[in-house]
Amino acid sequence: MSWQAYVDDHLMCDIEGHEGHRLTAAAIVGHDGSVWAQSATFPQFKPEEMNGIMTDFNEPGHLAPTGLHLGGTKYMVIQGEAGAVIRGKKGSGGITTKKTGQALVFGIYEEPVTPGQCNMVVERLGDYLLEQGL
């Protein structure tokens, strides 16, 4: 399966039990900031934004004072799992990022999708990739 198929079929799909509800944008990005696959709607990000996210995975709490920035959008960092998941909120939407051995899985959402639904979609794929050694 191609990386694009993972994004299209496992991240940008309808959320279980909520036909028509799906993430706004999604991507799989290597730890080095290289895009493996992304939805057409995923924002263009700066290398320093990705560096900040990677730093927060290695030093949990790094982004808390400044927020998580992606594609020029600032998200307030909320509870996550140190070294594994970063979650952010902006207005009625937000972002979930799951770190795997080689990649970061991103999901961005807006209402009516809930934070919990975004977390479920992103973390399920991230956990699968971890199980595959990726």
Curated annotation (Swiss-Prot):
The keyword RNA-binding does not apply. It is found in: Cytoplasm, Cytoskeleton. SUPFAM superfamilies: Profilin (actin-binding protein) (SSF55770). Coiled coil: none annotated. GO terms for molecular function: actin monomer binding. Phosphorylated by MAP kinases. CDD domains: PROF. A motif (Involved in PIP2 interaction) lies at residues 84-100. The variability of the residues taking part of IgE-binding epitopes might be responsible of the difference in cross-reactivity among olive pollen cultivars, and between distantly related pollen species, leading to a variable range of allergy reactions among atopic patients. Disulfide bonds join 13-118. GO terms for cellular component: cell cortex; cytoskeleton. Keywords: Actin-binding, Allergen, Cytoplasm, Cytoskeleton, Disulfide bond, Phosphoprotein. This is Profilin-1. Belongs to the profilin family. InterPro entries: PFN (IPR048278), PFN_euk (IPR005455), PFN_sf (IPR036140), Profilin_CS (IPR027310). Gene3D superfamilies: Dynein light chain 2a, cytoplasmic. Binds to actin and affects the structure of the cytoskeleton. At high concentrations, profilin prevents the polymerization of actin, whereas it enhances it at low concentrations. Pfam families: Profilin. Occurs in many kinds of cells as a complex with monomeric actin in a 1:1 ratio. The modification Phosphothreonine is found at residue 114.
